[in-house]
Design a protein with these regions (language model features):
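Mixed-charge, low-complexity intrinsically disordered regions
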Residues: 1-78, 87-146
Length: 146
């Protein structure tokens, strides 16, 4: 299903969502992570704050809706953003790591894989990642299909 087709189907249930679609795939292993969202295992994500600023891209806002895509840019589900916060990488909580639903869901696992990921992203942008680098933490819930 295309993002537009899924959006149109959900709009029949929730007409207030409007016409503008924000569709995206997770940067690493989009099929696995999209499936974790679909099954309800993954209800949070993290991204690099400095990259939003570098690309002059606004942060997601609570109450907005996104279409989650797989690696083939096909729609998997629609989520509603329920919480957005910014904090240093080193202050991310075990609770947030658990909500991300990846690996063994521990903070140690989360820190290991996200530090590697953020170092690569920062390096590609000519920046240096440190434990004090800010991350954008988002929580969400799947709203379609239920």
């Amino acid at each position: 299903m295309t993002p537009q087709e899924m959006w149109n189907a959900y709009k029949q249930i929730n007409p207030s969502i409007g016409d503008e679609i924000d569709a995206w795939a997770f940067g690493v292993d989009p099929d696995l992570l999209a499936d974790l969202v679909f099954t309800g295992e993954k209800t949070a994500t993290a991204s690099a704050y400095d990259l939003y600023a570098l690309e002059d891209e606004p942060l997601h806002q609570e109450g907005t809706f996104d279409v989650i895509l797989d690696s083939q840019d096909q729609a998997v589900c629609i989520i509603e953003i329920t919480k957005v916060s910014v904090q240093p990488f080193k202050q991310v909580s075990a609770d947030h790591a658990y909500k991300e639903g990846e690996g063994d869901k521990s903070l140690a696992y989360w820190r290991q894989v996200h530090e590697d990921f953020f170092k690569d992203c920062f390096g590609e942008a000519g920046l240096t990642f440190t434990p004090d680098s800010k991350v954008v933490l988002e929580e969400f819930r799947k709203v379609y299909p239920l």
